[in-house]
Amino acid sequence: MSGTTRIAYSGEPGAFAEDALIAFFGAEAERLAVGSFADVRAALLDGRAQFGVLPIENLVNGTVRETLDLVRDGALEIVGESVVPVNLVLAALPGVGLDDITRVYSHAQALAQSEPFLRTRTWQLLSTYNTAGAGAAIRDRNERDAAAVLSPRAATLHGLVELASGIEKDPGNRTRFWVLRSTASAAEISARSGAPRTTLLVGVRNEPGTLLAVLQLIAAAGVNMSKLESRPSQGGDWEYVFWMDLDAGANDAALQGAMKELAAVTSELRILGSYPRGAAL
């Protein structure tokens, strides 16, 4: 990868999004930390970054719908995915003990994922935009009666000391991130191994049996669907588009045949990306 290639992610250093970035591009990758998911999209479209990472799915909390909406218009292309484990610790400034804590900061999902542990105390639980940012805020404000729920790496980066580890209620929890680029970009990534996956956006007319017809065509082609998600179409009241992950590459003959037939029964049909599936760390 060229040394001038920059990858955008949402959050502070140590965020799970940065973990996903490092897992995909390597620890030496040049990074651009931005404040929100929408800022990642903006950085790709204005050229400040050539690639970006956004979370799309968590095993416990499900689909990240904001990400779906940000790639809805086709301005971004999915070129890869990265899957990272969600390991959580409780950390505070050096010298702070469990009995000193009155409040705990973290992203709402991280608080929910560690709730059984957190509810063993009478701490006030306060939601922040991201996990690593919670740790940075405690450090910057020198809060000696507060702790953060975040990853072990984020705790270390922000000068915090672990008070409890493995506090997530599901030790197998993982988050899947999309690796994205602008569809107008010529930026390339190195070849990756992994089973193929293609993500489609499908719109159907508001008529009986239209979604069923789509599913039957995909099944008849022998292509497995691993994910199906609906979102408002933004084009009419109570009308929806569907996001589909298919276990086939865009050049797969079976999928190409299905796409030709799908065009006849859909109001909108677009490939948002075809890429190798990411392996869990």
Language-model-detected regions and their locations in the chain:
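Domain-level signature for soluble enzymes in the chorismate/prephenate branch of the shikimate pathway
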Residues: 1-281
